[in-house]
């Protein structure tokens, strides 16, 4: 068994245990393997171990992998900051984007999404910690942004994403994740019909699952320590 395969098994076991502790079905939770800085060969090894969904932060690096792995039925998620000049590449090559935080970026993605492809699945990135250095829309601005994105053709608004500040304080982690879950619930009370909470990484996935995560973004625990970009 390869290291990546054994790592995937361990992460899946963590997700399943956390889900059971929360009274949830583990099948509700998608493991997104974050492959930024790792080679296409390592993504291929993860696919051989049953992994289909992969997350990337850097467009040029991701495009090379998407081309190299085009023989595999992979689902590609863009999870990094979105530059205006990269929206066409994202819209043309990815299945999901988790990091939409501005209406003009959403418009550019919609304009560039090829008509022959399924709608681009979109999550809004929310700055749940209030840190000026963090990307994301402020919680009070989520609803108008959601309305704008929902109205765009070729995009499908699915939910919310957050990257809270790193912390060993489990209660702080839970508050951040709970805040995102409550925002989603508020949108759904207004009829948005969203089903996705993208939150939780290698160090805090259990807390995220407890608070309702449906996608956990796992890099280090799958591929090992991050290589230099």
Give the positions of each predicted feature.
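Conserved alpha/beta-domain cores
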Residues: 1-203, 209-211, 225
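Gly/Pro- and small hydrophobic-enriched strand-loop and loop-to-helix capping segments
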Residues: 213-229
């Amino acid at each position: 068994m390869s290291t990546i395969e054994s790592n995937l098994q361990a992460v899946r076991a963590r997700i399943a245990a956390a889900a059971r502790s929360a009274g949830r079905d583990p099948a509700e939770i998608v493991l997104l393997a974050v492959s930024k800085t790792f080679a296409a060969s390592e993504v291929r090894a993860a696919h051989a171990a049953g992994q289909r969904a992969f997350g990337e932060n850097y467009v040029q690096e991701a495009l090379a992998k998407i081309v190299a792995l085009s023989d595999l039925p992979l689902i590609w998620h863009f999870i990094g900051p979105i530059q205006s000049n990269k929206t066409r590449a994202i819209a043309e090559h990815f299945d999901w984007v988790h990091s939409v935080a501005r209406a003009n970026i959403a418009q550019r993605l919609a304009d560039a999404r090829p008509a022959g492809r399924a709608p681009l699945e979109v999550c809004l990135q929310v700055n749940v910690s209030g840190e000026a250095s963090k990307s994301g829309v402020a919680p009070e601005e989520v609803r108008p942004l959601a309305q704008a994105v929902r109205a765009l053709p070729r995009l499908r608004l699915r939910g919310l994403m957050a990257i809270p500040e790193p912390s060993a304080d489990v209660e702080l982690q839970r508050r951040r994740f709970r805040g995102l879950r409550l925002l989603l619930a508020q949108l759904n009370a207004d009829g948005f019909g969203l089903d996705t909470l993208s939150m939780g990484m290698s160090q805090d996935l259990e807390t995220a699952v407890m608070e309702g995560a449906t996608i956990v973004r796992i890099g280090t625990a799958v591929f090992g320590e991050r290589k230099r970009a």
